[in-house]
């Protein structure tokens, strides 16, 4: 949620007139729920709304909190979310699209040019691959095959996966794997 905070706040500003009138926990609940609606496709919208309303009902000391949460999230889930690409000012548009402060957007564009800065902005949302160091090099091949990992091109005892979870494996529990970036293994 933190990585997309500026974007989420911009979207919420389209449906909430005065953020300062909301209790901080209500605003945070709306941010978290909006994140689920916008970026997590495995959770149905109705479930996000129901869960948020239940939290507001249990947490809130006023009746209005649950009604507000319900209304805002139903509105957001029933129509396309606002599109930041329609923002006319370039720095503001990139700020909202990539959830970066305007001052940083300006600085990177001034320093690297718009094309290079845009590549930097886009790289912030590329998911890193998972990498581990195998503590017993004699079992490297076996562990690679079992976990579906590839051998590292940088480290002779490293394994990498584009997605996955090494920490849940028996190898990790037995101490045969250490979560470590490839470059740290050199």
Describe each PLM feature range.
Residues 1-40, 133-134, 153-167, 171-185:
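Conserved AdoMet
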Residues 79-186:
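Glycine-rich nucleotide cofactor-binding entry segment
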């Amino acid at each position: 949620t933190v990585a997309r905070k500026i974007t989420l706040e911009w979207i919420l500003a389209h449906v909430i007139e005065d953020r300062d009138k909301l209790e901080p926990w209500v605003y945070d609940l709306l941010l978290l729920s909006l994140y689920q609606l916008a970026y997590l496709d495995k959770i149905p919208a109705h479930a996000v709304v129901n869960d948020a309303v239940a939290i507001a009902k249990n947490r809130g000391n006023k009746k209005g909190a649950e009604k507000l949460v319900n209304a805002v999230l139903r509105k957001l889930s029933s129509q396309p979310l606002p599109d930041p690409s329609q923002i006319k000012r370039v720095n503001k548009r990139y700020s909202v699209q990539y959830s970066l402060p305007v001052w940083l957007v300006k600085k990177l564009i001034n320093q690297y040019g718009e094309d290079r800065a845009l590549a930097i902005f886009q790289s912030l949302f590329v998911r890193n691959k998972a990498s581990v160091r195998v503590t017993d090099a004699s079992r490297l091949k076996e562990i690679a095959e079992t976990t579906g990992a590839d051998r590292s091109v940088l480290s002779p005892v490293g394994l990498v996966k584009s997605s996955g979870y090494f920490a849940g494996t028996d190898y990790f529990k037995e101490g045969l794997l250490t979560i470590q970036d490839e470059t740290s293994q050199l």
